[in-house]
């Protein structure tokens, strides 16, 4: 799966052609702080490139501001609920404003870990076995069927918020209760022991895979955004055939959900070398710790080129 840089950069040569661009960031989700950092970096890059851009920290007056500002397109860099789950995409569709990233359905699906897994499983794509937790009895049944260790996840949060690895029933019940603070729907998955990879897509192409290493139990919020000892390996260390398999699996996983524009898939590899899909992010982080800019650099794109490529692939709103 060879990259074509000319195709990635198509439509980025004239920054003025984008018109007036609103960078949407912040919001009210648990990932607000990450979104503020991502939005600041995206806005700074667009302005430096000569794009007529301005930022909006998304609040209740958003629709009024979009109308008053007479914007030509929106760069969505909201993370989590209210921005990455299809609701913002639906608002922009209704307003007739083109926007970056995936559409309403793909955004909603990818934000919902349970339904993402169901789509993948229906197509025979590999993803860890799981259970839905709504009670202590569910925890007991999941423990009996899946065994330990397990990982508990809120179904609709990103940035590893509310996630925990557990090794016994008491830990599982406590982790379920903690995750339920963030989401009424909680999943528990079989723990896959082995290296974790992340693979970004941009304008229909798959960027170089990155292998993640952390002294933390898993690649959690601190490892993603705060730690200085997280290791990123690119090239990822897989042989050519295995990396091709990983990239092809990522492409199939994203296609199954209808991902467009850009995104990032997280994948585990077990001791037998098999890959397991975890989730897809439709508006990944764009901070100095973020993975999509890192993958883009490995492909030969600097941060500004990446931002312009994402913007150039804005989805036309049907209105």
Swiss-Prot record:
GO terms for biological process: cell wall organization; peptidoglycan biosynthetic process; regulation of cell shape. Mg(2+) 1 binds at residues 266, 279. GO terms for molecular function: ATP binding; D-alanine-D-alanine ligase activity; metal ion binding. Residues 117-312 form the ATP-grasp domain. The keyword Magnesium applies. Mg(2+) 2 binds at residues 279, 281. It is an enzyme of class 6 (ligase). It comes from the Bacteria. Pathway: Cell wall biogenesis; peptidoglycan biosynthesis. One of its GO terms (cellular component) is cytosol. NCBIfam families: D_ala_D_alaTIGR, PRK01372.1. The keyword Cell wall biogenesis/degradation applies. Its EC number is 6.3.2.4. Pfam families: Dala_Dala_lig_C, Dala_Dala_lig_N. Belongs to the D-alanine--D-alanine ligase family. This is D-alanine--D-alanine ligase B. ATP binds at residues 143-198. It is found in: Cytoplasm. Binds 2 magnesium or manganese ions per subunit.
